[in-house]
């Protein structure tokens, strides 16, 4: 956790982070609610650090997926549903697979980003009580608990997976 105070020195941009940050800057100029770009960059840093060398079936780095989910969520919330255009939810989208797929824990997320983000990321995790549940069950849980704001993140997660499914079927 040595990165908490010096992540900025280690932060590197990439095409995926540039695309997301550019979208957020544009939305911040057009909406009354502003997303904290520095906090988003910190989340990008941790997503890239902890997803590390994981690769998607498309050959892209795995961290491209959560950054694209965050992009889709930002685009929707910034243009259509301003009440959910918030820093904590953009960060949740960026970190949505970290507890499930990396060594980044809920406690670590809480120390870095606070309990709201940590709880949201945990709610998006498909491992419940050491049992992996289906994507459908995960959606149903979020729906029945009326966690609409993070349900949108899960839906954009599924949308991005569907958009990129051709890689897993043909490659």
Predicted segment positions?
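Active-site helical microenvironments for divalent-metal-assisted chemistry
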Residues: 1-171
